[in-house]
Amino acid sequence: MITFKSIALTIIFLSYFVSCVSSQRETKFLNHGFLGANLLNFGSSKVYPSGLLELTNTSMRQIGQAFHGFPIPLSNPNSTNSVSFSTSFIFAITQGTGAPGHGLAFVISPSMDFSGAFPSNYLGLFNTSNNGNSLNRILAIEFDTVQAVELNDIDDNHVGIDLNGVISIASAPAAYFDDREAKNISLRLASGKPVRVWIEYNATETMLNVTLAPLDRPKPSIPLLSRKMNLSGIFSQEHHVGFSASTGTVASSHFVLGWSFNIEGKESDFDITKLPSLPDPPPTLSPSPSPPVSTEKKSNNTMLIIIVAASATVALMILIFSGFWFLRRDKIFFIGGARKFSYQTISNATGGFDNSKLLGERNSGSFYKGQLAPTEIIAVKKITCTTRQQKTTLIAEIDAISKIKQRNLVNLHGYCSKGKDIYLVYEYVPNGSLDRFLFNNDRPVLTWSDRFCIIKGIAAALQHLHGEGQKPLIHGNVKASNVLLDEELNARLGDYGQGSRHSTTGHVAPELVNTGKVTRDTDVFAFGVLMMEIVCGRKAIEPTKAPEEISLVNWVLQGFKKGDLLMSCDTRINRENLVAREVLLVLKTGLLCANRSPESRPMMKNVFRYLEGTEALPHDDYLFYGV
């Protein structure tokens, strides 16, 4: 028998069921802060009691993500087209003690599972294997604060539209259009100040617009980015919407203060008074106001100040002359801003240079792994100088080396000197040297995507060292063992700027044998050979090969003349993922760099442009001459 109570319970259950279903199909929401919001947090992401969403803090190599609790239906069930949407959010990026990094992205993805994704430039969304894969079906709008040259970043403060990878299909320096002045005004993403973003997609016109402005400014009439694109192939099902941010060796805190989203309509506007506040910056101490000084005390205070100042001046002069005399005894001066470590600090960090800490030994010195602090791992290179002149020359270069900062170079933190030995303190790069990946079987086989990225990274590093309009810094020893790979397999060129040292057999330019002088041209020659080694997976000289294959350069040249350059490609590379156009580009560029005539070799800026596809290679006939 059906009772009133059973009917009531049924109605309550159906109401609850309908509310659950409708919440799962939610297509419009407005969040002033995220306390109690329908939000899923992953990684380092968290919500403050104030409602402020923090994706990452200033710790290194973090990934933080936050997604709306239920997927959003972005495909039109009545047609093959996707639906229109509009969203707006307010974010802020505050940098740590160093440079800001790496940025955040608004993400639309079919999945919230990003296991295997890399931090830093990959924003916690992709890795080197799946970057650019059309099966990802991911749209991301990136707000990038670190320039990755190998990913075609235009600068270290830009906004980009990313489709299935972190190489933007459209990007622009961060700015907003000022309607009163009728011009774009630059906007610093990592200023620590709130920035509002509007992202709108019109499915009918297949147009995606991205607009941004400071929080206290109205929405500009002209977007920063407008891209005509049909997203129906991407939004073929329900997708998750949210945010992803990451840090690398440089770090920032990434915050989101509010978020509005709507399908087939305009996003709701914010009430700025309801937004959570950002954390206070570290307090700066200001001196307390001095109490008034009586007239009677002024003369006594003045005399006291004179006496103290005179005493301090005398003491300072004594200290300066004592230090000068002490340094004169050794006739070696450490100049500039390079950090000097005590020998005890370096010894403690490496366990007294214990053999268990030994990373490797080369002609140029021995490398040790060390730990300065729980989170600061270092690599220490010990160089024993045979003459005073050698030590003086090396020390003179330390200051110049320490000032060089580029993401594809291994950073020099500082140095230590004791007796005949110099200890160079570098950042630790975890995956070791490139030669172990190319020539040994104890490491995974590098994919073609990895290799091409590594080649472009080395090119960017050499271009930076060689410089433009300034005195170049010659590497002098470009080879696979001097290229280190970080956690994301990015190339980090090391062992640069330490005197004139010749490359190993096979990498030595012909003129170097006669003159003994390293130049930009000899670096270019060595890099050309290294490019071929990376593609072919073998060393420049292999005496056990057939006579026509002993020299890698000659072997590649034979393939070029036969019209079959791909024959020399490393057979371990998965052919399904091989991009023949890129392989040919690298091998031809390598032959051009390995020209026997230094005048015929390109400069590194041209080499980099060849690899980026922004400058065409010379005609093929030109490559035959002089190789």
UniProtKB/Swiss-Prot annotation:
MF (Gene Ontology): ATP binding; carbohydrate binding; protein kinase activity
Glycosylation sites noted in the Swiss-Prot or TrEMBL record: N57, N78, N127, N184, N202, N209, N230, N300
Compositional bias (Pro residues): 278-292
CDD domains per record: lectin_legume_LecRK_Arcelin_ConA
Signal sequence range: 1-23
Biological process, per Gene Ontology: defense response to other organism
Keywords: ATP-binding, Cell membrane, Glycoprotein, Lectin, Membrane, Nucleotide-binding, Receptor, Signal, Transmembrane, Transmembrane helix
Domain Protein kinase: 353-623
Residues that span the membrane, as ranges: 304-324
Membrane topology: Single-pass type I membrane protein
Binding site for ATP: L359, G360, E361, R362, N363, S364, G365, S366, F367, K381
Residue intervals on the Extracellular side: 24-303
Subcellular location: Cell membrane
Segments on the Cytoplasmic side according to the record's topology features: 325-627
Domain comment in the entry: The protein kinase domain is predicted to be catalytically inactive.
Family named by the database record: In the C-terminal section; belongs to the protein kinase superfamily. Ser/Thr protein kinase family.
The protein's name in its UniProt record: Probable inactive L-type lectin-domain containing receptor kinase III.1
Organism: Arabidopsis thaliana
Classification lineage: Eukaryota, Viridiplantae, Streptophyta, Embryophyta, Tracheophyta
